[in-house]
Amino acid sequence: ESDRNRLCMYNLATGEKTYLTESFDSNVDDFCWSDTKDAMIYFIGVWHATENLYAITKKGEVKQLTDYCADFGSLQMLGDHKHILAERHSYGEPADLYVITPGKDIAKTAIVQITAENKHITDQLAKIQVEKRWVKTDDGKDMLYWVVLPPHFDANKKYPTLLFCEGGPQSPVSQFWSYRWNFMIMASQGYVVVAPNRRGLPGFGSEWNEQISGDWTGQCMRDYLTAIDDAAANLPYVDKDRLGCVGASFGGFSVYYLAGHHDKRFKAFIAHDGAFNLESMYTDTEEAWFSNWEYEDAYWNKDLSANAKRTYENSPHKFVDK
C-alpha cells in the first residue's frame, strides 16, 4: 500500500543509496540481476494496466522489453545469466512459466512458454474477449478501463453489466488472474465486466496514483461513474437497465459508498471485506499509520481537519437510507 515502489541500490561500504527507476513513473513489482559484464537489472513494472518486463542500463536508462496484454511476475535469473524464468497470466489465462531471453528492445526479446498446467481444462472452456477503452473523466483526464466480454459474444444482444471496483486502494487493474474475483468466471455467466483504472492506481503516473490519498469518496468515485456511464451510453450491448457494482477491500468500500450515491444506476451490489464504517475501522485496525495517512486524523478529531471531516462524514454507513 505504498504510493510508489521504487528500486534502490544500497552501497554497504558507504551507505549511499541510488534510486534506479526515477524515470519510470510507476511501481516496481519484482526484479532480478544479471551477473554479467553488462550487469543489467530487470524488473516488472505496471504501465497502462499491464505488467511487463523492463531493463535498467548502465546509464540508468529504463527500457521496456515486453509488451503483452498480460502480467508477468516472479522473476528468477537462471544460472547462465542470459535467461529469465517468469510466470505470466491474464484475465483469460491462469499462470504458466515462461523463459525470457532479454534483448535490447521489445522486438529483440524472445519468450518461450514452458508449462501449460491448465491446458486440459482451459481447452474445454469458451474464450472471453478483452478490450481497452479510454474515456474522458469529469475533470478532463484520460482514463483507461477494461471491457471483458462473455464467451460467444454477440454485439447485437444486450448483456447485464458489472462495474468492478478495485481494492488497495492503490493496486493496479492490470491483467491479473484471480482465484477469487475472476473476470473469466463473471463473463462466463453472461456478464460484461467494466473495470476502470480510476484515480489512485499505479501505471498512469504518480499524480494519478497519489490523488486518492485523503480523498476516498471524491474523484475516484466520480471516475467509477464516468466509466459505467460511458459504457451504458456508448456500448450498445450494455444493458443500462441491468447494471451491478462489485468489489473487494477498498473495492468493497467503494460498493458500499456507491450504493448510497448511484442515482439509481445499479440494480445490485456485491461487496467483499470492504470498510463500511470508517469510525469503527479507525479503532479496529492494527495498521494505524495507514488510517492516519488516509483519514488525516482520528474521528474524534475530525473537526480539526478539513480532510478528516470530509472522510468521516462520507463513511458509507451514514448513507444506508439513500
Residue spans of the language-model regions?
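Non-catalytic accessory segments flanking enzyme active sites
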Residues: V62-K157, S174, S178-S188, D230-A233, ...
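Short loop/turn segments that connect beta-strands within beta-propeller blades
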Residues: N11-G15, I56-E61, P102-D105
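Alpha/beta-hydrolase fold active-site loops
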Residues: M143, P160, R242
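Active-site-proximal cap/loop segments of hydrolase catalytic domains
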Residues: N182, A187-S188, A195-K322
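Blade-terminus and WD-like Trp-Asp/Gly-His loop motifs, strongest in beta-propeller folds
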Residues: F31-M40, L75-H83
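A flexible loop/linker signature enriched in serine peptidases of the S9 family
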Residues: E1-C8, Y19-V28, F43-Y54, Y68-A70, ...
